[in-house]
Design a protein with these regions (language model features):
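Acyl-thioester-dependent acyl-group transfer interface
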Residues: 1-61, 71-96, 228-248
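Acyl activation and transfer enzymes in specialized metabolism, enriched
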Residues: 33-51, 107-123, 192-231
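Conserved alpha-helical substructure of the radical SAM core
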Residues: 97, 104-106
Length: 248
């Protein structure tokens, strides 16, 4: 794959961090008092030792993206405007922090991690920030902090045993889907909204115990419910989930 094709393929996955870009994700936290940007930046820099795999930039090679350590400071900005990853504005990082008033947000390239891998960073950032801001000695149990050993399962390459380059192209083929299952097969005027309520704590407990994602669990539950309600249909079931979760 040439440089031009590489650029067209990878650029959308590397750079823009904005609400409409599905290749990035973020977490917003609202505190009780205005954010101290200097302490927040200090906390972010301290966590570099514990989360080195988030403090990186990438180099494009002939057919791959190679992550390498990024010694430049992680950007901590007093603004709520989007930022472009892997540019001078973000110090060529694939993660950035912003704050405004009492709220802060950490944005990251989704290709680096998912929610399960991102949440420990958020928790640890808040732990260090609050400890320094209020001079607290908090129980560190359950937090990932500097000085701890980083397990291989956390930072290793799960695909190291696979020789992707040796596989013959195309790697994956799927027959085109001509039609999807529709709960409301009629005109738009006949559509209905169905509400399904699940206990949040039970859902999260199940996901943690099985190392799974709430999105995947919801998709499976809804798909199986549809199959049970209409077992004669063989149409493909498409589940779309809005990835916006607000917690007070």
């Amino acid at each position: 794959m040439g440089d031009k094709e590489m650029s067209e393929y990878y650029d959308p996955m590397l750079y823009l961090s904005a609400p409409g870009n599905a290749n990035t994700m973020g977490c917003t936290v609202t505190l009780g008092e205005p954010i101290d940007g200097d302490i927040l930046a200090e906390a972010a820099e301290l966590l570099r030792e514990r989360f080195p795999y988030f403090y990186i930039r990438v180099e494009k090679t002939e057919n791959d993206l190679v992550p390498i350590p990024n010694p430049l400071p992680l950007t901590v900005r007093n603004t709520w405007e989007p930022i472009v990853f892997h540019t001078e504005a973000s110090n060529y990082h694939l993660m950035a922090i912003k704050y405004e008033g009492k709220r802060l947000a950490v944005e990251i390239l989704h290709g680096l991690t998912d929610g399960a891998g991102f949440l420990p960073y958020i928790k640890s950032l808040l732990f260090v920030y609050l400890s320094k801001k209020y001079h607290l000695s908090l129980d560190s149990t359950g937090f990932r902090l500097p000085g701890q050993e980083i397990p291989e399962a956390e930072s290793g390459n799960p695909f190291a045993h696979l020789n992707i380059d040796a596989a013959e192209a195309p790697l994956y083929q799927k027959k085109p889907v001509k039609d999807f299952y529709r709960i409301n097969p009629g005109d738009r005027g006949e559509n209905h909204v169905f509400y399904v309520r699940l206990p949040e704590q039970e859902v999260m407990r199940y996901c943690r115990e099985n190392d799974g994602s709430p999105n995947a669990l919801m998709a499976v539950i809804l798909a199986r419910a549809i199959r049970k309600a209409d077992p004669e249909s063989e149409k493909t079931i498409n589940i779309t989930i809005a990835e916006y979760i607000a917690r007070n």
